[in-house]
Amino acid sequence: MNKLLENCLFEKDSQRYEKIKEIAISFTKEYIGNNILCDHIFSTVETYCRRNGFDVQIFRLPIEDEKIWAFTSIKKGCIFVTINTSLELNKQIFAAAHELYHIYCYIDGDDNDLVNGSILTDENAGDIDVAMEEREANAFAALILAPLKQVVQQKKIADVDSDSVAKLIILTIYLMDCFALPYKAMVIKLLECNAIQKAEAEYLLSEEKNVEAFILSREGLGSRWLKKTNDNNLNAIKEMIKKNLQEQYISEEKAKADLKLLNEFMSSMTKKKNQE
């Protein structure tokens, strides 16, 4: 069996998968509703943290090492989430949803691992020989970005028969466009929905590069989520703090503390990168 399929939570531990599905359904009901998230995931992370009494800053920065998707840490009670914007947008979205699970475990599950930091790499996202919480985070991310009921509904709307490999690829591309899931995650989602068999999933996974190249060449369905954005919102965050001070939404003391904390965090990230 394909290593990715073998190690995904759905195949590795079906009971634990069902538990994560319950958590995802409850979370969706409370914080998402009937919406399809796509790139609204970033504001959902902020909403969840703030509703639970935590300050949060999401940095969207280009990082040279594309194996790093995202990392999260806590400094002086503030949650910092950094997303690598040199990646395709659908990977950024998945990374944010993945990190949200670690934040959820910290806030609702008394998991203190975030104090030391959480990092999502290309290997973690591929579910190959990773810790159980990483598998859970990947499953959670896919479940909130593409809830099973909505996937089944969109599959029905697409009205694409899955009686051939070509049609399966068309269906996968259509659903990738709907939910902004990376290709591999979408294939596993189809398996979870019993829309495809394991053999079909293995074949689809083997065609990842060819399918993504096809999508980009046609600039059609799914292409918007495969673009690398290279966003950098660090200066925007600093300006927002200064503007909040000018508008007297926060005190001068709070603004200074926030800017100091921001600079300390970025300095610590620079040191960590240099050490690597």
For each predicted feature, which ranges?
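Active-site hotspot residues in diverse enzymes, especially metal/ion-binding acidic/histidine motifs
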Residues: M1-E276
